[in-house]
Amino acid sequence: MKNNSFKKIILVTTLALTTNLHAQENLDWSGPFVGLDAGYTWTTDEKNNASRDGFTYHAKNKDNGGLIGINTGYNFMMNEKWVLGFIGEYKTYDAQDSDVDLKDGVPDDVTTVSSVDQKVSLLAKLGYLIDSKTLLFITGGYATAEMSRHYDEVTPNRSEKHKNWQNGWSIGFGSAYNFYENLSANLEYRYTDLRTNDINIAMWNNAPQPQKVSQDEVTFGVTYHF
């Protein structure tokens, strides 16, 4: 009798522990979160059809390099499978390139040095849980990035620097996996179009240099869910 009672206690305790462990393993995706990420950017900063002195100029900078970022936001569970989220993120870059201007298709004595410095994005995210731990999602929204450009001319020997923010939109997709308690690992691809900005160059009588910027990025990150 005592042996049967002891077996029942063990069985009940085991079931309780198993249920509790299972509950801990299933992340509640709703609520606030904060995350860190790192990755690589392929940024194109293209000066196309810039006119001055009766000539047309072109340069294409490949500002490729590393990035790190931080993000925060809030998720809403729409039902058992669908997650709606809103995200604010900040990224800083180590990505720079230089290119010799083409003057009517011929290399000129002007070099354009370009770099992407930092970016801020405000995004919405729609995700689908394929199981309790794995979320597939798409994301999109507003993005603005600070660009630095240095225009160097050989003859006459002069140069001019500019910093400006370019606005546009961003869209992407990715996945998140709850690998431990309140932590998830994230892998994401993002495309960003920062459109075209005219940079007026004083040393060329304020001739506008149309600079079009676009980005492809791959990032890996870790998120903590509160």
Describe the role of every protein-language-model region.
Residues 1-23:
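Gram-negative bacterial Sec-dependent N-terminal signal peptides
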Residues 3, 22-226:
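Gram-negative outer-membrane beta-barrel domains
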